[in-house]
Amino acid sequence: MLRFPFAVSTSVFAIILLPSFALSAQELNDLIQKELERNFATAIVLTDSDVFTVGFHDFDPNEWLNLDNEELGSADSVNLRKKIGVSTLPFEFALYEDPDSQIKHSLQGRLSALGIEQDVSIADVGVSDSHREYVLGAFLEYTNSRQLSENWTFDASIGAHLMYYRSDYTYRSDALADYKSVIDGYLVNTDAWALVAEPNVQAKYLQMKPWGKWYYWSSAHYFYGQGWGEANRGQVGNPEGWYWVNGVKMFYDFEKWGRAVQSVYTSFNRVDVGGDTSESLGTHHYYEASVGWLMTPPFKTQWVDNVGIGLSLNYGSALKGGSLVLFFNQD
């Protein structure tokens, strides 16, 4: 089974069920704590839409392109993508702009929900258990943006995540009957909270063209937090990790109707990950590419910059594969 957060309990179960492997109470607590830390850390990465894209229809690009590249997609990874649901609602508020120093101050953030529901086969008993997990999050950050030159900008931000994790496990088999007392309420059928700080910096090189614009960007993030709650007797640990995104985006404007502008949007990113995120994603780095059509609204609004539809590919992670996606406020 694929190693992934929210499917994490399977790995713990496998260790517990080994007949030759005896865990002390402290070792079991440490194992559960690490799994909870990975849940929160990986949710931070997967709910950042600049880092990971989830669509409404998933597929294996190998079947479309007549290829056999394991890093591009597989039946297992596409099946896993189909079980994951991610919803985000980003927002941004301008605070103050100093025209003399070309410094902008703003608040931005997002509300998010990430969940997965899947069958869990613990032993060869013919009946699978069911496990449903989700993480709800609210993120808010302050950003100081400096215009270094005509093309270069530099942003420094500090933010915080408030996150809630919930596990609902249904025992359909007797595979875990002898171990229910040490996992129920500790690893499964429980909940936990985390408050996570995230400083980050971003450099951006922008070129405006008669046909639109393109830019290169590099954004480095580090996060560290404190967990608490019912899970694992309150020993939820300290989610910690980092990710670094380097990418290029291009917007080609091909049609304009009044205020409405239609554009072709393309992007290519490399994402490096570390800390509690790398094992869950099955890699230390992966790539994402997107292409699509965007349209700005024909009326003036501060809430919607553009909407569109397109295609996204993930290469090299546990969630490799392709998706049809809806774009919202791409910039």
What is the meaning of each model-derived region?
Residues 37, 41, 78-101, 132, ...:
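Subset of outer-membrane beta-barrel
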Residues 1-73, 99-103:
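Cleavable N-terminal export/targeting peptides
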Residues 30-38, 42, 96-243, 268, ...:
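Outer-membrane pore/translocation modules
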Residues 53-64, 102-110, 153-157, 215-219, ...:
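Residue-level detector of the transmembrane beta-barrel scaffold of outer-membrane proteins
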Residues 91-97, 142-146, 201-209, 252-256, ...:
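Residue-level signature of outer-membrane beta-barrel architecture
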